[in-house]
């Protein structure tokens, strides 16, 4: 691995190991990824996949490489590089916010056949004393956006 690749790995994909007070090595990151996804692979196939990633002959989803383990167990959205949704319902906005907060890119369509399904936006707004309480979590922020 050259210096640039090492920097990218350490700064983006290597987990911090608190008990060892350091970040993962490339080999440890690959092991974490392969161990996470490889439980259904025969041993020989798992070894081949591990070697191919170690040697950088192939690259898995980098989002999944970053999040494999507890983070991906908590929320599988974090394993995707990108997603898509049409903007055809108000709920699309909070869904988009949630997916973005998980670190996944979102492509969207605002084509006529989709946006014509949205409710009209009022031309004027009235004063309100409404308070929106936001739970400090990805889900909390997305739900508050819906309010």
What are these regions (language model features)?
Residues 1-147:
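Extended catalytic cores of very large enzyme megasubunits
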């Amino acid at each position: 691995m050259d210096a640039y690749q090492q920097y990218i790995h350490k700064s983006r994909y290597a987990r911090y190991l608190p008990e060892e007070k350091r970040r993962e090595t490339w080999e440890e990151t690959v092991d974490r990824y392969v161990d996470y996804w490889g439980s259904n692979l025969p041993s020989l196939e798992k070894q081949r996949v591990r070697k191919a990633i170690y040697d950088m002959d192939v690259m898995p989803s980098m989002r999944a490489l970053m999040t494999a383990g507890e983070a991906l167990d908590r929320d599988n959205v974090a394993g995707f590089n990108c997603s898509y949704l049409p903007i055809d319902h108000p709920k699309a906005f909070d869904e988009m916010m949630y997916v973005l907060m998980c670190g996944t890119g979102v492509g969207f369509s605002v084509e006529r056949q989709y946006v014509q399904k949205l409710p009209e936006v009022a031309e004027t707004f009235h004063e309100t004393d409404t308070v929106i309480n936001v739970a400090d979590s990805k889900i909390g922020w997305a739900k508050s956006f819906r309010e």
